Amino acid sequence: MDAAAMESLILELHAIEAVKFGAFVLKSGITSPIYLDLRMLVAHPRLLSTVASLLGSLPATRPYDLLCGVPYTALPIASVLSAAASVPMLLRRYHVTPHAAAECLDGSFRAGDAVLIVEDLVTTGSSVLETVAPLREVGLVVADAVVVIDREQGGRENLAANGVALHSLMTLTEVLAVLVKRGKLGEEKAQEVKRFLDANRKMAVPGLPVKPKVVRKAFSERAGLATNPMGRKLFELMEAKQSNLCVAADVGTATELLDLADKIGPEICMLKTHVDILSDFTPDFGHKLRSIAERHSFLIFEDRKFADIGNTVTMQYEGGIFRILDWADIVNAHIVSGPGIVEGLKLKGLPKGRGLLLLSEMSSAGNLAHGDYTAAAVKIAEQHSDIVIGFISVNPASWSVTPSSPAFIHATPGVQLVAGGDSLGQQYNTPYSVINDRGSDIIIVGRGIIRANNPAETAREYRIQGWHAYQSSLS
């Protein structure tokens, strides 16, 4: 918007009393000498249309698929923009119960869709972030917000800290300058407002602490740091397929598992199995699964959770009816029995180029894998980096002791599009939260995909969301 158009718009907003001066208590709790009331736009359809059109012309950092207006004043603006630009719109209900993000949204969307937030005013940015949260909870990507007026009181900075770029038609400073220039505002009152702005330039969002963003090296770069060939292969495969999705194939029969693997194979980097729950297991199961894995380029992770002494686990790994060593690229282990378990698995796995994940944390409520246990897992991993490729973890960003090398990968179970839990104590987090807030690399999804009506399509949605979260964590 050029200077002349902005000046004309400011004068029109002043004429309809959308800009007022006095003493007003804002949502943030502070008293302001100026009040901006853009609700008045609904009484002036031509001006409403102009504002919507101008907002639509603001450049976003990425193309968007949907619009979402912040309740309530911005809703008519977003509606007009949606109709004019033929961009579908989502409605966010204002009151929503915890872990019910999907229920607070009306409209049609898919995980991975990009949403442009539409707002009338931004002070601290809290209202925008309250709308961003449920959108991200259901797998939508939010990178931009457009606003009519930026009050310049910390909103831009608070939003940027949460991964949202703010684009405004005008700032409050520009509004004051035009009104003084055109004789609509006295210099004394303008100075009072400016002093207020100077004293309140960077306000924190009330009750919404800014989480530090986890920034990581690219998978392609970390591949070169891996000492284990399977760890290197996993990084390279994720980069090539643009997938950091692992599906937990917790089904009851080998027939179901092989069918599922073939359907979702193109979307995943890894398939997690529990071979000992397959009621129809036969010795050729491993060969059949490896054929599917090779066809679709994914790794097989047998979630055996070895926990015994070294001598016993070598026999469990290599022998028995399952012969896990023959077909599983990766296995995992508890460290309760000490480093001997890793040495035993390494004895058999390393000559075959296999990889090992250590259980450093778990996603079930009340588990004991945390604190000193997690620190011990890190120490053992670094002592055996030739076989250990990473960890099963829940919140590696919170660890007091962290691996010295980014070659170790983190895979996190308990991921769904909406946060919450189940009746057996499993705790679920969203892909965005797991990758950006908790610092993991791979999302492990089970019931969210295997119980879906269309597992392949649902896996694609999770893959897109997980990959977008990874990409946003690179800078």
Swiss-Prot record:
Q: Which GO terms describe its molecular function?
A: orotate phosphoribosyltransferase activity; orotidine-5'-phosphate decarboxylase activity
Q: Which GO terms describe its biological process?
A: 'de novo' pyrimidine nucleobase biosynthetic process; 'de novo' UMP biosynthetic process; pyrimidine nucleobase biosynthetic process; UMP biosynthetic process
UniProt keyword Transferase, yes or no: yes
User: Where, by residue number, is the active site?
Assistant: K305
Pathway of this protein?
Pyrimidine metabolism; UMP biosynthesis via de novo pathway; UMP from orotate: step 1/2; Pyrimidine metabolism; UMP biosynthesis via de novo pathway; UMP from orotate: step 2/2
Enzyme Commission number, as recorded: 2.4.2.10, 4.1.1.23
InterPro entries, per database record: Aldolase_TIM (IPR013785), OMPdecase (IPR014732), OMPdecase_AS (IPR018089), OMPdeCOase_dom (IPR001754), OPRT (IPR023031), PRibTrfase_dom (IPR000836), PRTase-like (IPR029057), RibuloseP-bd_barrel (IPR011060)
Q: Which domain of life is it from?
A: Eukaryota
Keyword Transferase present in the record's keywords: the answer is yes
| Alphabetical list of Pfam families matching this protein | OMPdecase
Q: Which reaction does it catalyse?
A: orotidine 5'-phosphate + diphosphate = orotate + 5-phospho-alpha-D-ribose 1-diphosphate; orotidine 5'-phosphate + H(+) = UMP + CO2
UniProt keywords (A-Z) are: Decarboxylase, Glycosyltransferase, Lyase, Multifunctional enzyme, Pyrimidine biosynthesis, Transferase
Under NCBIfam families, the record lists: pyrF (TIGR01740)
Which family, according to the similarity comment?
In the N-terminal section; belongs to the purine/pyrimidine phosphoribosyltransferase family. In the C-terminal section; belongs to the OMP decarboxylase family.
What's this protein's name? Uridine 5'-monophosphate synthase
**Could you tell me which species this protein originates from?**
Oryza sativa subsp. japonica
